[in-house]
Amino acid sequence: MKLLISFLMIFQMICTNVEFYGKSYIVYDSLNQYVVEGRNIDYLQSVASISKIMTAIVVIENSRLDKKITVDETINKAYGSCVYIHIKDQITIQDLLYGLMLRSGNDCALMLAKSVGGSVDRFVEMMNEKARDIGMKQTHFSNPSGLDEEDEGNLSTVKEMAMLYRYCCQNPLFNQIVKTKEYKRLDGKGYWHNKNRLLKEYPYCVGGKTGYTKKAKRTLITRAIKKQVDLIIVTFNCGNDFEFHQKKYEECFKNYEKLVLFDKGVRNIKGNWYLFENDLLMSKEKDESVSYLIHNEEMFIYRNQTYIKK
């Protein structure tokens, strides 16, 4: 018998002792796909270079890593953070992706967009199509880099950027790129260090992306996993963002734990047989009680007798 289990977004205040000095933030439970806590989670603003998360996943899903492209005059429009590739250089999609995500190369963003979309404008359409597919209803992308000096930039919220990052983390190649601390170009012409310093400073950090423009200020997404508790934090305009992320993770990991509701396999529940294709996991506060009710082949899960998801 098939059991329908789908996750709903909820808002709960769980970890609240770390002071936040910024515009908006979210702590997002990647496993259960809900909001642990946050502030101004639906506030819409330019998100700067964390936009490149969407750029990366669109490229990964629509191109081959080993494809070589010839750099053309498209990069003449690049400014700000760049890895300084040159016209007529031949470079792989793989190298461009690492330059995009580790060094936030705006030149990489433009060349990837041109290669995958045929034009930068068509690639931006692909970014917005993917946003709709993921359920990012407020988000709108104007370019593949996150620059916002010539227009309002790429607009999103901490909640929707967390949703995007969670989606991307289902892709093994994306995870491999964002957790890489140092990368040597395949052609040997460059050696790049990841700007996400939490990868070196915090052992449970497994990826993320930095961002900054004068308009957006600092933007940061990180992900950390400890004892299978999988959290994503997004901050906008937070001056001490790396410190805040690390302290918030430690606070949440102290109060949070993974619970296995049902192991993978065939299970008899109150006289009916159900097949669980994977372990059914959820995260909860350590002093929380969790219960469930099965009705019409749907499972309703309760925390402290409060319905949270089905």
Question: Each PLM stretch: what is its role?
Answer:
Residues 145-147, 289-292:
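Short linear loop/turn motifs
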Residues 35-37, 291, 308:
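Generic structural signal for well-ordered beta-strand positions
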Residues 136-137, 152-263, 267-278, 284, ...:
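Domain-terminus/edge residues, biased toward the C-terminal soluble/receptor-binding domains
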Residues 88, 264, 284-285, 290:
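Glycine-centered loop/turn motifs
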Residues 3-13:
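Sec-dependent N-terminal signal peptides
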Residues 14-172:
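Active-site-adjacent loops and short helices of periplasmic peptidoglycan-processing enzymes
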Residues 1-3, 310:
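N-terminal secretion targeting segments of exported proteins
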Residues 294-296:
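Cysteine-rich modules of extracellular adhesion/ECM and protease-associated proteins
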